[in-house]
């Protein structure tokens, strides 16, 4: 393969990947509007998202949400379950377009001493005797010749870059 062929093939592959990503995003957007279509017909007016939004603000700090608790946003947990049956009939795949509520749930009260949700991990030092070599050796690999290694080091140490005027 020549360099031009590699560049062209890479460009085509990147284009195909980008088109797939765009197609998935468009499909998700269509599903979202399909689910919201019936709700907008009931309201008959454009909602003001700054005032009437049912979505709680997403916080990057999980501790802030857990401190305030889900009681701060009482309508958030109930508004998404009140979809009309007509909206469900129009769009059968509406069940997956509801926003996740995992950021409003508190973690289970188990053991507060263990952080990061993991169990205690025991570390053991490994000695050379504990490590077993694979059966059959290393096949065609040879031992490193120290004379050849030092000769290669000297050859590279003597090489110098030469700059010329352009």
Swiss-Prot record:
Transmembrane parts of this sequence: 6-26
Record GO cellular component, one term: membrane
Membrane topology: Single-pass membrane protein
Subcellular localization, as worded in the UniProt entry: Membrane
Main location: membrane
Keyword field contains Amino-acid biosynthesis: no
Positions of modified residues (Phosphoserine): 40
Keyword Phosphoprotein belongs to the record: yes
Pfam families in alphabetical order: FAM163
Keywords: Membrane, Phosphoprotein, Transmembrane, Transmembrane helix
Recorded family membership: Belongs to the FAM163 family.
The protein's name: Protein FAM163B
């Amino acid at each position: 393969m020549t360099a031009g062929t590699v560049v062209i093939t890479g460009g085509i592959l990147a284009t195909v990947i980008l088109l797939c990503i765009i197609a998935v995003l468009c499909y998700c957007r269509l599903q979202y509007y399909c689910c919201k279509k019936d709700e907008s017909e009931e309201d008959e007016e454009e909602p003001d998202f700054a005032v009437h939004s049912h979505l709680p603000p997403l916080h990057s700090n999980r501790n802030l949400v857990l401190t305030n608790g889900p009681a701060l946003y009482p309508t958030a947990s109930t508004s998404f379950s009140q979809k009309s049956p007509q909206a469900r009939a129009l769009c059968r795949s509406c069940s997956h377009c509801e926003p996740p509520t995992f950021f409003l749930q508190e973690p289970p009260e188990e053991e507060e001493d263990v952080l990061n949700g993991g169990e205690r991990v025991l570390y053991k030092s490994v000695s050379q005797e504990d490590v077993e070599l694979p059966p059959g050796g290393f096949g065609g690999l040879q031992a490193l010749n120290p004379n050849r290694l030092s000769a290669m080091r000297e050859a590279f140490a003597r090489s110098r870059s030469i700059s010329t005027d352009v």
